[in-house]
């Protein structure tokens, strides 16, 4: 038994047999690429949701592994035949869904069975929701890590979002984002009709495209719906794209460009230098 199996079986809630609700307003889009050994675990975590919705796979690297996994779970596969790249693949994934709510599920990650149930509850409670996001844990070497320096810093940054009133404040969310990005991209569900038309992510970014998107969305009137429960597990491993891009300093360059949207040049450089130390938490 792989360690990843151990994490999945012990950290994911079991769905009651009576959980047969289907929500036609939501779609899970799994971004799949290469030969990930974790893809099936991701799919199973979505199938175990207490509220069911549509699941599909989007990929720019079709292969036998992805095809067999899709066939085994009876999932449709959408192939991106246009421009490739991590950001382009995310935009393509969003375009494959035709529902009000869309969650981009990263193939290496897993979701607690109550994720969608809590997401829909939170979104229904907001007058004009923009995105939903939750707290999360990391998966390192097959083990669940609920707290480390990086996670603790992010949770402190997210404290203002515990207030439903402050979730609606453009000022507050921009002050939070001016210090970095505490929002974990795989934990986000997008309310597509309430977001600007056009690509959700800027294709000139390769690793900070999520933070760049939050910065643009933060200017819009509406709600950043936050759930403090640990509703998903984000896998950290050497082969991940994020880890590779940190190694070649891509993230440093992109994050500095975003800090400049909030701060004068010298202040942006100083803050980025402090923020860069947090990148070490994404290395194995």
Residue spans for each PLM region:
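Glycine-rich, basic loop-to-helix element that forms the pyrophosphate-binding segment
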Residues: 81-97
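Short, acidic, metal-binding catalytic loop of nucleotide-sugar glycosyltransferases
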Residues: 44-53
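N-proximal low-complexity "stem/linker" segments adjacent to membrane-targeting elements
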Residues: 1-45
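Acidic donor-diphosphate engagement hotspot in glycosyltransferases and nucleotidyltransferases
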Residues: 90, 111-119, 142-143, 209, ...
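Short aromatic/hydrophobic "clamp" motif used to bind/position activated sugar donors
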Residues: 102
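Conserved donor NDP-sugar-binding/catalytic core segment of glycosyltransferases
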Residues: 114-154
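A conserved acidic beta->alpha catalytic loop
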Residues: 58-67, 106
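Conserved nucleotide-sugar donor-binding catalytic segment
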Residues: 29, 160-251
């Amino acid at each position: 038994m792989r360690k990843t199996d151990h994490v999945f079986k012990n950290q994911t809630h079991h769905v009651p047999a009576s959980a047969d609700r289907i929500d036609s307003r939501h779609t899970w889009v799994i971004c799949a690429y290469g030969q990930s050994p974790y893809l099936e675990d991701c799919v199973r975590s979505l199938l175990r949701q207490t509220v069911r919705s549509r699941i599909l796979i989007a990929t720019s690297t079709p292969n036998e592994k992805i095809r067999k996994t899709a066939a085994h779970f009876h999932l449709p596969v959408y192939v991106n035949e246009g421009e490739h790249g991590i950001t382009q693949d995310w935009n393509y994934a969003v375009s494959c869904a035709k529902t009000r709510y869309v969650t981009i599920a990263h193939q290496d990650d897993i979701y607690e069975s109550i994720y969608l149930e809590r997401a829909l509850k939170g979104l229904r409670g907001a007058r004009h929701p923009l995105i939903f996001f939750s707290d999360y844990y990391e998966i390192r070497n097959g083990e669940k890590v609920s707290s480390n320096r990086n996670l603790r810093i992010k949770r402190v940054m997210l404290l203002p979002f515990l207030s439903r009133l402050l979730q609606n404040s453009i000022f507050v969310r921009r002050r939070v984002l001016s210090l970095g990005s505490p929002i974990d991209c795989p934990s986000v569900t997008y309310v597509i009709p309430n977001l600007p038309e056009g690509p959700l992510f800027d294709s000139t970014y390769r690793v900070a495209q999520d933070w760049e998107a939050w910065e643009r969305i933060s200017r819009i009137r509406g709600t950043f719906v936050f759930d403090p429960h640990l509703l998903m597990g984000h896998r950290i491993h050497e082969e991940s794209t994020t880890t590779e891009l940190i190694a070649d300093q891509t993230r440093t360059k992109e994050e500095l460009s975003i800090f400049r949207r909030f701060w004068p040049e010298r202040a942006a450089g100083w803050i980025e230098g402090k923020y860069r130390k947090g990148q070490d938490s994404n290395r194995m």
